[in-house]
Amino acid sequence: MPGAMRQSTSNLELLTIYEVSKILGSSLDLQQTLREVLRALAYQLQMHRGRVYLVGEDNVLRLVAANGLSNEAAAQIEFRDGEGITGRILKTGMPAVVPNLAEEPLFLNRTGGREDLDEQVASLVGVPIKAAGVVVGVLTIDRISDEGPQGHFGSDVRFLTMVANLIGQTVRLHRTVAEERRFMMRETFRMQKELRPVAAPINDVVCTSPNMLEVMAQVHRVAPFKSTVLIRGESGTGKELIARAIHNMSPRKDAPFIRVNCAALPESLLESELFGHEKGAFTGAQKDHKGRFELASGGTLFLDEIGDISPNFQAKLLRVLQEQEFERVGGSKTIKTDVRLICATNLNLEEAVGHGKFRADLYFRINVVTIHLPPLRERRQDIGPLARHFVAKFAKDNGMALVMEDEALEVLNRCTWPGNVRELENCIERAATQSRDGIIRTESLSCSLNLCNSSVLFQYRTLGASVGGLAPSMGPGAINRVPPGRPGGPAAANAPKTPAMPAPVPEPAGAAAARGRPARRVVPRPLAGLRRRPAGGSGPPDPACPCPSRAPLPPQAPPPSPAAAPPPAAEVPLDEPESGSLRDRLLWAMERTGWVQAKAARLLGMTTRQVSYALRKYNIEIKRF
Ligand SMILES: Nc1ncnc2c1ncn2[C@@H]1O[C@H](COP(=O)(O)OP(=O)(O)OP(=O)(O)O)[C@@H](O)[C@H]1O
């Protein structure tokens, strides 16, 4: 073949290899993937009638993907070890070339379809598919020619061997995952029989509801193994806590638990954070720096927000997970790693794979054992024990006596908690800082709940619900609705108070000392523009919202005439002032995400830089926990 011709052929082959590797990483369905690989071979390189056979446990080759053959027809075709040309490839582990099939006595023509070739000659090239040195299948293609065998079979064999290697890796990955799944299912079945409720908090995890008890049983089951665990659940449901619990119950508990928030770092930083860098790798790299993979050696690496890493970085991570080794940025030495991986995400990874945003092969790698954390609204039994746990924790951290009224607990029980356990924890902490006598009462929750409920408010607004209909659930009046005789109770109902901005409460000295930082001033903030609707406001309370104010409001004074003096803020309908809308949403998002700007940005569909700018613009003090 002339030089130019060979050059263009190898370029085409390279392109096809690129296509094939993309196809293999793009779908969760192995058969479908293999059919597409064969289609690409036929389309790009005129390699027709492609066939992929895989070896079963009985050492029989079965056809799993074929060009131009129905699934039913393909399912019938099999070769035993040594049978026909295909069986020989399995037996010898060597490629085979048949220049003219019509003259080959070994050819069994089991798949048929070559009868209408007339004057053309069909040749066959077949190569073994190997995984970790073992033959797991056979890939064959036909070359059809008008002029007899063309004699390019050497390059065909080389090229098909590369394709077969890629297929081998994919098959191995699918089989490993399937095996681990089967193992876990057997284990789950066995352990379910022994499942007993877990009464006391384990590793600080409070759990009394049946679904959290099941989660903890799962934690017990997976902890002893090295299997990768994927923890899924909404923001604030306790994914990191569960990851730590798995580590603490594992044989690796005395080695480090290292966490990386993948969403918080741009790709270049993430790479050097995870893999480390060598001195001089980039401007500012003044000395060698160990990455988190190295720091977690012998222990557990927790990759939080794994769904947020870029496609480019997904490929890098996949390589490390497959090969268990990596190089530091700017370094050439290969470093071996021994970490147990736990990943977490609140994204729908299957959807991301479907949209091509998350690699299917990485998905398989990390989705070995999955633990789903239910949102707090689906495990209301946990609200009381969690609230008491946070009260006790605050009291202990600050060296003070603190209790919570039963009525306050009732209020908490009726909220929807879109920010989950983190929102509940923040709410209790804010209320605790306002308690002057060591008792958390319904009233002291009000300011906290303004913020908590703002998230619900935003959800309803984005759904286009009637703002008036929300008011009883959200407004401070709702929280201020307390029994007669109490400050702010029905006796004062006709003149409800606007919740005054509470004075900054100095943080108790103990807390600051415990954190090793100077004391901060906790400034509870009522939500700007959050005002109560007038009595009889339009729109029914939403039945999905169990917040306290679903009960009817006490009678209200009629709305003032336009000529009258402006009413107190609490008397005005619950419309969001135009200028305050972004501020409200910001507060909501920051509260919901535990004041992590990157997460809040994602929730709002903004960039982190935009959120940071908006926080400054609205003069919102950033809380640090
Ligand atoms: N079952 C629980 N018992 C006690 N505390 C809990 C529980 N679940 C969550 N928490 C507390 O709630 C807060 C949020 O939990 P965590 O950070 O683990 O959530 P997450 O799901 O990882 O959130 P994100 O997705 O936003 O990273 C933490 O302070 C954690 O200690």
Curated annotation (Swiss-Prot):
> Gene3D superfamilies from the entry?
1.10.8.60, 3.30.450.40, Homeodomain-like (1.10.10.60), P-loop containing nucleotide triphosphate hydrolases (3.40.50.300)
GO annotation terms (biological process):
nitrogen fixation; phosphorelay signal transduction system; positive regulation of DNA-templated transcription initiation
C-terminal DNA-binding domain: annotated span? 583-625
Renumbered residue ranges of the record's region Disordered: 478-578
Q: Where does the chain bind a divalent metal cation?
A: 447, 452
Could you tell me which Pfam families the record lists for this protein?
GAF, HTH_8, Sigma54_activat
Enumerate the residues binding ATP: 233-240, 296-305
Q: Taxonomically, which superkingdom?
A: Bacteria
- Where along the sequence do coiled-coil regions lie? none
UniProt-listed CDD domains: AAA
Record InterPro entries = AAA+_ATPase (IPR003593), GAF (IPR003018), GAF-like_dom_sf (IPR029016), HTH_Fis (IPR002197), Nif-specific_regulatory_prot (IPR010113), P-loop_NTPase (IPR027417), Sigma_54_int (IPR002078), Sigma_54_int_dom_ATP-bd_1 (IPR025662)
Q: Where is the GAF domain?
A: 29-171
**Region annotation Inter-domain linker: residue ranges?**
434-582
Annotated Pro residues bias: 540-570
Sorted alphabetically, the keyword list is:
Activator, ATP-binding, DNA-binding, Metal-binding, Nitrogen fixation, Nucleotide-binding, Transcription, Transcription regulation, Two-component regulatory system
Compositional bias per record (Low complexity), positions renumbered to this chain: 489-498
Task: Identify a single GO molecular function assigned to this protein.
Answer: DNA-binding transcription factor activity
Assembly with partners or alone: Interacts with sigma-54.
- What is the designated name of this protein? Nif-specific regulatory protein
